[in-house]
Amino acid sequence: MYTFRYKSHHDASGELKKKYTSAESVLSYVERMLNESAASRRVIYLHVPFCNKICSFCPFHRPDELRRRDYHRYLIEEMHRICEYPYMRAPIDAVNFGGGTPTALLPEQMDAVLTELRTCFDIAPEAEISVESSATELTAEMLEVLKKGGVNRLSIGIQTFDDEGRTLLGRRGSGEHAAHSVRRAIESGIANTSIDLIYHYPGQTMQRLEADLAVIRSLGIAGLSFYPLILHEKTPIYHKLGEKERALL
């Protein structure tokens, strides 16, 4: 659908800074933009800053878990707050749920957000609606909610199918369960399913990497994002590794 996909908020922020003058704040630029009727294609991004299990390599801030139970209401309030701006009245070509892990919300919370999304905005018939998830959150109930809400793309954070690697990286469930979750998502009708894979983590061998790639080939996924492990200070995996191990990464 698009020629380029920004992989992180860092990339998106860099592009945003090119859009407004140095004398103008980001807030005033966004306010001005929302009050204009432009012909460019529209994308909505919804952020869910929660995870049911924190990856051992994750350096990001964790918000108060007590906020999670009401977070869908916050998203719905925000949608209603901006949907009447002239800029948002045009058809929406794509919707991206990122995080965090958006499917860390309860199925009924996700259902409420997806339902209200179509109430607030004119979602184009061919719009890509993409949700990030981990393997363990893709239960039959969650998949049913996503399909009902029009989700047609999934990005699943697998990282590795190797059981020892999954334990080291703080992923829940076995590699076999992760592969089953990917298959189930595709079989549910979300053919545009992609996964994230991490390489160059401690203990990974060429044989383990080749085994991961063999599983991937068998799944029939639509895309693969392949990243090296980036070691951040103050993360569990950083403290677990010795100085010599850290120096090799």
Regions found by a protein language model. Give the residues of each.
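Flexible, acidic/Gly-rich N-terminal and inter-domain linker regions that tether
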Residues: 1-44, 53, 88
